[in-house]
Amino acid sequence: MATTHLDVCAVVPAAGFGRRMQTECPKQYLSIGNQTILEHSVHALLAHPRVTRVVIAISPGDSRFAQLPLANHPQITVVDGGDERADSVLAGLKAAGDVQWVLVHDAARPCLHQDDLARLLALSETSRTGGILAAPVRDTMKRAEPGKNAIAHTVDRNGLWHALTPQFFPRELLHDCLTRALNEGATITDEASALEYCGFHPQLVEGRADNIKVTRPEDLALAEFYLTRTIHQENT
């Protein structure tokens, strides 16, 4: 079926292991309820009608994905990821087809809310460079002394935001910025940082702070609580 200007492809880099989870199983394959974290993350994307396809970049040696129902989903494409996140995203972009806009979403961020996703997708009507979901920093921030666990000073949190995902950009722009940044040896921690490196200024779309990334063991219980609460609210 031909794509339209409204169609969006989502890219989910899922080739990482996540050693901070202190488990032999990659964190995206840990279960919350009757689904893996990866399944929760992908289904949240597919719940929006504009997201017509999801490309998942997995490790070439991954044997777990084929055991999931996602492996046979008609809207899912699987590609081999790379050593770094940016390599996996580029592999996903190459498989995204001719869509104008792409989302990039963390495999281990299962608590995405549909209202946040809808507001982010609306950027395609008002922005040429896209933007990201983000949450204003509310905690007091400290900078440490170099090489020490000692406070150097308090950082002014005004204007500081936590970068979340999804992140949403024109496909060709993101591809070109990632390629240039990697070729020039830039440090790329998320997709927005590639655009920043190339002189662009993506928009900040305020999202819910409970859109957490499961990184440490204690995050798993918190994500389960948030997902259970959301399901309960939807059913009442």
Curated annotation (Swiss-Prot):
The keyword Transferase applies. It is an enzyme of class 2 (transferase). Pathway: Isoprenoid biosynthesis; isopentenyl diphosphate biosynthesis via DXP pathway; isopentenyl diphosphate from 1-deoxy-D-xylulose 5-phosphate: step 2/6. PROSITE patterns: ISPD. One of its GO terms (biological process) is isopentenyl diphosphate biosynthetic process, methylerythritol 4-phosphate pathway. HAMAP family: IspD. GO terms for molecular function: 2-C-methyl-D-erythritol 4-phosphate cytidylyltransferase activity. The record marks R20, K27 as: Transition state stabilizer. The record marks R157, K213 as: Positions MEP for the nucleophilic attack. Catalyzes the formation of 4-diphosphocytidyl-2-C-methyl-D-erythritol from CTP and 2-C-methyl-D-erythritol 4-phosphate (MEP). This is 2-C-methyl-D-erythritol 4-phosphate cytidylyltransferase. Keywords: Isoprene biosynthesis, Nucleotidyltransferase, Transferase. It holds the Pfam family IspD. It comes from the Bacteria. Its EC number is 2.7.7.60. Belongs to the IspD/TarI cytidylyltransferase family. IspD subfamily. The gene is ispD. It catalyses: 2-C-methyl-D-erythritol 4-phosphate + CTP + H(+) = 4-CDP-2-C-methyl-D-erythritol + diphosphate. Homodimer.
